[in-house]
Amino acid sequence: SRFRLDAEIVRDNALAVSGLLMRDPIVGHSRPYQPAGYYRHLNFPTRRYAADKGPAQYRRAVYMHWQRQFLHPMLKAFDAPSREECTAQRPESNTPLAALVLMNDPTFVEAARALATTILGAEGRDDKQRIEELFLRVLSRGPRPVEIQTVLQFLADCRENYKQNPELAARLL
C-alpha cells in the first residue's frame, strides 16, 4: 500500500515485531527518548525532559508524553497532529525525514537490534531461513525469490563492511 501507518502505529508496530512493546496499561504517561535540549525554547515554566529507563519507554504510543506545542520529533516526522487543534484527517507527507527517523531514532535502533537478536538467536537456521522468518514477522508474508537474493547480497555486503570496520559494528551495538 502506498499509504503508511499513522505515527503512533509506526512506533508501536516496530516495538511489537521486535518484542519490546509493553502492552500493560499504565497510570500516567511514558517518556520515550527525545533529543537533548528539545524543550529549551519552551517557557512558562521552562521544563527538562527525562526519558524513562527500561521497559517503561516501550509502552504503547497512546501513553506517550505529549507537550502541546512541542510534539515528540518522531511523531512530528510522521505527520501526527499537534494538540493545539482538532483535525478530522491527518496530512500525509513522504519526506526523507521519516526515513531518517526510522534509521536513527534510538527507539527504532533498539527495536531493530532486539529483532535481529531474536532472529539470529534461532539456532540451526541458515540465512535464507532467517530472512523468511524476518519477512513473516515484519511483513506478515513470505519473501519473493528476488527479495531473498537482494537481502542475501545486502547481508554479505554488510558482513564484509563490518569485518573491515569493526568500530562501526561496535558503535551500532
How does the language model describe each region?
Residues S1-E133, V138, G142, E167, ...:
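An acidic, gly/pro-interrupted, aromatic-rich
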Residues Q149-E160:
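Amphipathic alpha-helical segments that form the core helices of the histone-fold
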Residues R159-K163, R171:
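Acidic/polar, glycine-enriched structural segments that form the non-catalytic walls/loops
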Residues G142-I148:
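Extended, well-ordered alpha-helical scaffold/bundle regions in very large, multi-domain proteins
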